[in-house]
Amino acid sequence: MDDFQKRGQALIDELKEHVLMTFSRDPRGSNNGPGLATIDIERLSGLGIQLDRASERKQEHWITWTILQRLIADGLVMPIYSDKTRYRRRQPTSA
């Protein structure tokens, strides 16, 4: 991996940490809360990207969604499926 690729990975890691910190800004995102919708996380974290032209596929939300999927895979966030998917921090496991 060259320096440019390393910087890209560092940016992804920063985004993951930033989104994780967002959960502590709203009690709904706590490990016993009802969860936050993707749009709530996007707004609280400041990751909303305003496009001049709205996309039918809502591509302006893909960054937040992708980071959430990575946090789920890492075991740090849990999806809650209902009428709309919501997310909350996972309960820390004791060692």
Residue ranges and their predicted role:
Residues 1-35:
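Short alpha-helical segments that sit at the start of domains
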Residues 11, 48, 83-84:
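Coiled-coil-like amphipathic alpha-helices with heptad-repeat character
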Residues 82-95:
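Short, cationic-aromatic polyanion-contact patches
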Residues 29-55:
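Short acidic, hydrophobic short linear motifs in intrinsically disordered regions
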Residues 72-82:
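A short, conserved structural fragment
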Residues 55-73:
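Short amphipathic alpha-helical interaction segments
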